[in-house]
C-alpha cells in the first residue's frame, strides 16, 4: 500500500516501567497540535496476540472502549476522543494478533506467491500498510501512533522495526519518535535519578531508533541541570528533554506540555509552519472547575463487579469528572462491590450514608448480580437518584419486575435459563451466534425518545445515537405488565422493538439505558445523562439528605435460581 505523502508521523514509545501515561501524552500532544490549527488523528498499536480486547477480562485489560463503527478497542482511545473531541474508528486500534491473522489469511489465499512468509518483510510490511490506513483517510496533517508496552518487551519488536524502516523511507522531517521515560525521586537521597532513562534509551538504540524527544515523568519538576544531564547521556538536545511531573488531574497535562513547549519542538522538527496560537482558556476553565468547584461535593456510589480494578470503569469515572465540572461540584466516587450485598451482612443504612446517587455499572455473567439488584432496590425505595448502564439497566428491570410487579422469579436468561419470567432475554439475532469475539451488538445505533419523558427533558431532542455492546435485551412480552406498575419505556429503536431507555414515573431520578453513554462524554461536551444524574444527586444532597431514611433494607434473600458463581 502506498503511504500518503505530506502526513507527518509521530510515534510515542515508553520505557522503564508500564503505565507511565503514553495514552495521556499522545492525547495531550494531539490536542495541542489541533489547537494550533492542524488536523490530527491518533492510533494505538497493542503488542498482544488477541485480535481485539473484546474477550479479555476487565481485570487484565480494563475497559473495552467501543467506537461508533463497532470496534472493541483499547481504553486509550477514550482518552484520544475526550482530549481531541474527535471520533476514533476501527482503524484507530491495531493489535499484533490482527496483524498475524491478516498475514496468515493472505498466505492461505496464496497472496505471497508461494514464498516463505517471515516477520521481515511480510509482518513488518503488513504493519506499515496498516499505519498508512488511517493516514489516507481524512486529509491529515499529523498522525500520532502510540505503541503499547515497554521498550525491551519482545512483543513490541515488530512495531519498532516498522517504525525504524518508515523513518528511513520517509526521512527525519516526516517522522519522529517521542520516548516517555521515568525519572524516579529517591527520598533518602533527596535526588532525581536519571540512570533508568539512560538505560531505556540504550535499549531503544539497540533497535536502531534514536529518540528525537524525551518526555520524563517524575514526582518532582526536572531542573535544568537534570535535563542537561539526560540530554548529554541520551544524545538529545536539552531543549528536547521535556519534564512532566505529577499533577492533580490528567487534564492538566496539556497545559504542562504547553509550558514545556513540546508542541513547538515537534512542529520545528517536522518542518510544520507555525500555525495559530492555541487558545486554551476553555481548558484552563475546565481544570479550574475540576480542581476548585464552588458548589460543594456529591458522593456517587458506583456498584460493579470489577471494583478492585477501577480501569474497568475508566470512561464512567471520566464522565463523572466532566459532569462534576459542568455542575460546579466535586464528584467523589465510592466503589461498591456487588458481592458484598449478597453476603447478608452489608449494612445499607451505614454504608450508604452520604451517598447521593447510585450508578450500577455494566458487566457480564451472574457473579454479583443479586448484589446489584439489592443496591437498585435500595435506591428505588429510598428515592435516591439512580442510573443503570447496560447490565445496570437490565438488573433494574429485574428488580422492578420482582419487587413491584410480583414476578418473584424474574430474571435474565443470561443468569438463569429456566426462569419463569425472562424479562431480559437473548436478542433474536444472537441465538445462532457461536463465536464470542466481535459478535455482540456493537457500535452506534439510533434511539427514538418519547416526548414528555425524563429522557426527553435530559436530551431535549427526539433522535439520538449511542454506542452499544450487548447480547441481551428487554423481553417485550413483559412491557405492558411493567408499564402498568409505573415503568416508562422512554427510548426505543426506531422500529419500537428494542427498549433502549427505562425510567420510573414516581421517582426523583431513575433512569436505565441499554447503551453506553460514558463513551461519548467529553471535556467540551459532557454527556447529558451524566450531567443530569449529577445535577439530581446535587439536588438530593442539598435537600433530601435532611430527611431521615425510614425504610430499612431487608436482609438479602437470594432468589431460588442457579447457584451464583
From Swiss-Prot:
Regulation: Allosterically activated by GTP, when glutamine is the substrate; GTP has no effect on the reaction when ammonia is the substrate. The allosteric effector GTP functions by stabilizing the protein conformation that binds the tetrahedral intermediate(s) formed during glutamine hydrolysis. Inhibited by the product CTP, via allosteric rather than competitive inhibition.
GO biological process: 'de novo' CTP biosynthetic process; pyrimidine nucleobase biosynthetic process
Pathways per UniProt: Pyrimidine metabolism; CTP biosynthesis via de novo pathway; CTP from UDP: step 2/2
Catalytic activity: UTP + L-glutamine + ATP + H2O = CTP + L-glutamate + ADP + phosphate + 2 H(+); L-glutamine + H2O = L-glutamate + NH4(+); UTP + NH4(+) + ATP = CTP + ADP + phosphate + 2 H(+)
Active site, UniProt feature: 390 (nucleophile), 516, 518
Cellular component terms (Gene Ontology): cytosol
Protein known as: CTP synthase
Amino acid at each position: 500500500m502506498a503511504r500518503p505523502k505530506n502526513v507527518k508521523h509521530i510515534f510515542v514509545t515508553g520505557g522503564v516501567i508500564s503505565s507511565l501515561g503514553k495514552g495521556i501524552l499522545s492525547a495531550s500532544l494531539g490536542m495541542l497540535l489541533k489547537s494550533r490549527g492542524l488536523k490530527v488523528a491518533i492510533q494505538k498499536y497493542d503488542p498482544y496476540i488477541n485480535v481485539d480486547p473484546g474477550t479479555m477480562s476487565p481485570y487484565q485489560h480494563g475497559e473495552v472502549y467501543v467506537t461508533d463503527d463497532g470496534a472493541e478497542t483499547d481504553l486509550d482511545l477514550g482518552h484520544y476522543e475526550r482530549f481531541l473531541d474527535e471520533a476514533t474508528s476501527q482503524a484507530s486500534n491495531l493489535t499484533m494478533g490482527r496483524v498475524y491473522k491478516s498475514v496468515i489469511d493472505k498466505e492461505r489465499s496464496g497472496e505471497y506467491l508461494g514464498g516463505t512468509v517471515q516477520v521481515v518483510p511480510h509482518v513488518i510490511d503488513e504493519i506499515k500498510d496498516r499505519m498508512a490506513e488511517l493516514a489516507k483517510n481524512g486529509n491529515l496533517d499529523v498522525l500520532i501512533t502510540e505503541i503499547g508496552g515497554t521498550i525491551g518487551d519482545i512483543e513490541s519488536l515488530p512495531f519498532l522495526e516498522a517504525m525504524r524502516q518508515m523513518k528511513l523511507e520517509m526521512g527525519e522531517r516526516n517522522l519522529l519518535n517521542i520516548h516517555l521515560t521515568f525519572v524516579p525521586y529517591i527520598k533518602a537521597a533527596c535526588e532525581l535519578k536519571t540512570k533508568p532513562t539512560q538505560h531505556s534509551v540504550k535499549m531503544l538504540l539497540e533497535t536502531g531508533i534514536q529518540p528525537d524527544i524525551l518526555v520524563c515523568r517524575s514526582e518532582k519538576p526536572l531542573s535544568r541541570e537534570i535535563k542537561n544531564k539526560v540530554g548529554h547521556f541520551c544524545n538529545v538536545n536539552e531543549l528536547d528533554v521535556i519534564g512532566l511531573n505529577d499533577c492533580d488531574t490528567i487534564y492538566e497535562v496539556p497545559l504542562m506540555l504547553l509550558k514545556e513547549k513540546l508542541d513547538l519542538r515537534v512542529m520545528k522538527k517536522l518542518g510544520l509552519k507555525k500555525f495559530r496560537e492555541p487558545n486554551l482558556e476553555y481548558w484552563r476553565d475546565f481544570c479550574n472547575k475540576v480542581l476548585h468547584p464552588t458548589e460543594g461535593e456529591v458522593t456517587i456510589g458506583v456498584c460493579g463487579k470489577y471494583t478492585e480494578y477501577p480501569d474497568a470503569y475508566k470512561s464512567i469515572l471520566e464522565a463523572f469528572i466532566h459532569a462534576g465540572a459542568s455542575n460546579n461540584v466535586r464528584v467523589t466516587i465510592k466503589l461498591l462491590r456487588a458481592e458484598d450485598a449478597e453476603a447478608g451482612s452489608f449494612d445499607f443504612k451505614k454504608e450508604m450514608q452520604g451517598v447521593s446517587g447510585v450508578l450500577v455499572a455494566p458487566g457480564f455473567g451472574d457473579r454479583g448480580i443479586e448484589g446489584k439488584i439489592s443496591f437498585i432496590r435500595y435506591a428505588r425505595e429510598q428515592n435516591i437518584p439512580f442510573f443503570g448502564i447496560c447490565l445496570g439497566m437490565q438488573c433494574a428491570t429485574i428488580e422492578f419486575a420482582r419487587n413491584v410487579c410480583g414476578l418473584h422469579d424474574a430474571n435474565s436468561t443470561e443468569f438463569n435459563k429456566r426462569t419463569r419470567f425472562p424479562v431480559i432475554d437473548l436478542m433474536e439475532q444472537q441465538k445462532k451466534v457461536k463465536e464470542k469475539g466481535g459478535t455482540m451488538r456493537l457500535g452506534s445505533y439510533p434511539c427514538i425518545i418519547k416526548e414528555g419523558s425524563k429522557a426527553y427533558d435530559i436530551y431535549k431532542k427526539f433522535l439520538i445515537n449511542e454506542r452499544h455492546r450487548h447480547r441481551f435485551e428487554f423481553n417485550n412480552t413483559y412491557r405492558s405488565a411493567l408499564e402498568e406498575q409505573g415503568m416508562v419505556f422512554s427510548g426505543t429503536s426506531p422500529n419500537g422493538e428494542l427498549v433502549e431507555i427505562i425510567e420510573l414515573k414516581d421517582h426523583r431520578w431513575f433512569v436505565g439505558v441499554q447503551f453506553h453513554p460514558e463513551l461519548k462524554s467529553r471535556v467540551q461536551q459532557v454527556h447529558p445523562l451524566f450531567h443530569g444524574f449529577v445535577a439530581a444527586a446535587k439536588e438530593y444532597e442539598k435537600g433530601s439528605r435532611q430527611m431521615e431514611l425510614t425504610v430499612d433494607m431487608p436482609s438479602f434473600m437470594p432468589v431460588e435460581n442457579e447457584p451464583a458463581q
